[in-house]
Design a protein with these regions (language model features):
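Beta-strand/loop substructures that line and gate deep hydrophobic ligand-binding cavities in soluble
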Residues: 80-108
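Well-ordered alpha/beta subsegment
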Residues: 103-127
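Short glycine-enriched loop/turn motifs at secondary-structure junctions
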Residues: 2-3, 26, 48-50, 86
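Terminal, regulation- and interaction-focused segments at domain boundaries
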Residues: 1-29
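Compact, glycine-rich, soluble single-domain proteins
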Residues: 33-79
Length: 127
């Protein structure tokens, strides 16, 4: 995790993985701001790309105090989850480690709880 990115194996397809994650977010009241289908957009211009989709999500209640404490954190918020398929056709769900974001932007450790719960939600989506 030297890059700050955590990769979690998913037994579901890329679209199914993100649909599961979106359902979990809906239950928890977490906003989904956008779903970007990188591979779908590539196909529209005649390029091939393994299935790759990005979900942008967050909660102003959780994220705003973080950005007040560390304004440059806004470059990494809202949070993102990337579902992608590797060369062996295995699907992964990747996201920025909350601890890495805390280290990168230097927001107070007591605010880490505002985003730390993402790990459990990601894990639930791929089970």
């Amino acid at each position: 995790m030297a890059s700050g990115i955590i990769d979690v194996s998913s037994r579901y397809s890329v679209p199914e993985t993100l649909a599961r994650l979106q359902s979990i977010f809906k239950e928890k009241g977490i906003m989904v701001f956008a779903l970007i289908d990188h591979s779908g957009e590539a196909e529209k211009v005649g390029l091939k790309m393994r299935p790759t989709q990005l979900l942008i999500f967050g909660s102003p209640k959780g994220g705003t105090p973080l950005m007040v404490a560390a304004p440059r954190l806004a470059i990494d918020l809202p949070l993102k989850a990337l579902a992608w398929q590797d060369k062996q056709r295995h699907v992964w769900l990747s996201y920025n480690s909350p601890e890495y974001l805390q280290q990168r932007h230097g927001f107070p450790a007591d605010l880490l709880k505002n985003i730390a719960g993402i790990a459990a939600l990601i894990q639930k989506a791929v089970e």
